[in-house]
């Protein structure tokens, strides 16, 4: 292999290591068995939610993870591997939610493991995380809870006003 090709690959590994270092959530999956259309749809949904998906040789993944200071994921870099990651600190549950949905829809996807905010995470923890509502969901629940007492008070005032109108009409 030429020195230029080796330098190019090292440059790629270094760039990917920087992306992994900045990532708040990293998921490692086996995607073998998905059609091109299914992978394309999953990538689009991930991209729409500020999440990236890359399919990279396992050797490069190991090197990039080592350069990024990520330990414990080496055993997941076996077989067909895709890395799904985001640097969006606002919602680290989004990658887990999307991948979990696709895993439920297509039996061929397998979550191998991951890392969330620097902590090694198992497949079961990722599935559990996927069931937690995202930032927008939590905010809408909070707004609903805050509005409930005001709404109930408004209904009570309206009911009292209507009953007084009925009493005065009689």
From Swiss-Prot:
UniProt keyword Cell division, yes or no: no
* Membrane-spanning segments: none
Q: Which Pfam families match?
A: Ribosomal_L10 (PF00466)
GO molecular function per UniProt: large ribosomal subunit rRNA binding; structural constituent of ribosome
InterPro entries found in the cross-reference section? Ribosomal_uL10, Ribosomal_uL10-like_sf, Ribosomal_uL10_bac, Ribosomal_uL10_bac_type, Ribosomal_uL10_CS_bac
A Gene Ontology term for the protein's cellular component = large ribosomal subunit
Key words, A-Z: Ribonucleoprotein, Ribosomal protein, RNA-binding, rRNA-binding
**What processes in GO biological process is this protein linked to?**
translation
**According to its UniProt record, which protein family does this protein belong to?**
Belongs to the universal ribosomal protein uL10 family.
Q: Spell out the HAMAP family in the cross-references.
A: Ribosomal_uL10
Q: How does it assemble?
A: Part of the ribosomal stalk of the 50S ribosomal subunit. The N-terminus interacts with L11 and the large rRNA to form the base of the stalk. The C-terminus forms an elongated spine to which L12 dimers bind in a sequential fashion forming a multimeric L10(L12)X complex.
Query: Per its database record, what is this protein's job?
Result: Forms part of the ribosomal stalk, playing a central role in the interaction of the ribosome with GTP-bound translation factors.
Instruction: Return the protein name.
Output: Large ribosomal subunit protein uL10
Q: Which organism is it from?
A: Lactobacillus helveticus (strain DPC 4571)
């Amino acid at each position: 292999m030429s020195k230029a090709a080796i330098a190019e690959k090292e440059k790629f590994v270094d760039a990917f290591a920087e992306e992994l270092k900045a990532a708040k959530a990293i998921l490692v999956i086996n995607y073998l068995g998905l059609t091109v259309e299914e992978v394309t749809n999953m990538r689009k949904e991930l991209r729409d939610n500020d999440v990236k998906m890359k399919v990279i040789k396992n050797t490069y993944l190991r090197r990039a993870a080592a350069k990024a200071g990520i330990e414990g994921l080496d055993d997941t870099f076996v077989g067909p591997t895709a890395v799904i990651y985001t640097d969006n600190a606002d919602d680290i549950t989004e990658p887990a939610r999307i991948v979990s949905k696709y895993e439920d829809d297509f039996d061929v996807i397998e979550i191998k493991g991951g890392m969330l905010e620097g902590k090694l995470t198992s497949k079961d923890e990722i599935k559990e995380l996927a069931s937690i509502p995202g930032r927008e969901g939590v905010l809408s629940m909070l707004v609903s809870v805050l509005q409930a007492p005001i709404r109930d008070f408004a209904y009570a005032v309206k009911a009292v006003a209507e009953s007084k109108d009925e009493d005065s009409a009689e």
